[in-house]
């Protein structure tokens, strides 16, 4: 358990590192309206994407422009500056950017450092070309992982088996696995059908 007391806005929090449960209570009888420092940080460590046109080929545009952007990845040193400033105040860091965080060349060091400073790392990935080593690192260090859903029903079959395989591998390894499903006018009907038919892979958390 991590206990955080916000002296400015007069409340305290208790965060369970094992399951992500957060309790917040006021001290002075007034509901807190904000926090002195974010409890969760979204940190874009990826400057470009290894997947190329993978998302677009699945009919989904990348909001990070990963298919046209080629910037350098965030350095481990710069990431550590963020972690050190957040230590003791931030409970979780969501790793992202213009690509899959598990493909960052120093992802193991990044995940280990988060845990060393008692910050829980999480990430979203396409699952494209995910390796057994990456699955193991996610299982060991991450609170949860979300897989971007890049598969559609076509003639009663999944259009992208790689997405299905990635979800199933993460679930089988014991990772808390969620699905990142982009709902739009083109996907809403299929999303409803999938929920009604319970057609997502078994064992996903949310």
Features from the language model and the residues they span:
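Generic detector of short, locally flexible boundary/turn motifs and exposed helical patches
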Residues: 6-11, 59-62, 86-89, 109-113
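Canonical Radical SAM [4Fe-4S] cluster-binding loop centered on the CxxxCxxC motif
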Residues: 32-77
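Flexible, acidic/Gly-rich N-terminal and inter-domain linker regions that tether
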Residues: 1-42, 57
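Residue-level recognition of conserved structural "scaffold" positions that shape functional pockets
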Residues: 17, 51, 104-106
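Radical SAM/AdoMet-radical enzyme domain recognition
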Residues: 76-96, 104-206
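Active-site donor-binding loop signature of nucleotide-sugar glycosyltransferases
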Residues: 25-28, 64, 149
């Amino acid at each position: 358990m991590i206990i955080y007391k916000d002296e400015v806005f007069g409340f305290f929090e208790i965060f369970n590192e094992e399951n992500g449960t957060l309790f917040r209570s006021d001290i002075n009888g007034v509901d807190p309206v904000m926090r002195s420092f974010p409890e969760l940080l979204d940190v874009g460590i990826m400057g470009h994407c290894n997947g190329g046109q993978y998302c677009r080929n699945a009919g989904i545009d990348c909001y990070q422009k990963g298919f046209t952007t080629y910037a350098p990845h965030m350095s481990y040193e710069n990431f550590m500056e963020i972690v050190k400033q957040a230590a003791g105040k931030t409970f979780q860091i969501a790793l992202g950017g213009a690509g899959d965080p598990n493909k960052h060349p120093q992802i193991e060091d990044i995940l280990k450092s988060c845990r060393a400073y008692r910050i829980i790392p999480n990430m979203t990935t396409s699952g494209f070309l995910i390796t057994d080593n990456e699955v193991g690192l996610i299982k060991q260090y991450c609170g949860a992982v979300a897989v971007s859903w890049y598969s559609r029903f076509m003639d009663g079959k999944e259009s992208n088996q790689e997405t299905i395989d990635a979800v199933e591998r993460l679930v089988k390894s014991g990772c808390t696995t969620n699905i990142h499903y982009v709902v739009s006018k083109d996907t809403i009907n299929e999303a409803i059908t999938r929920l009604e038919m319970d057609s997502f892979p078994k064992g996903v958390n949310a």
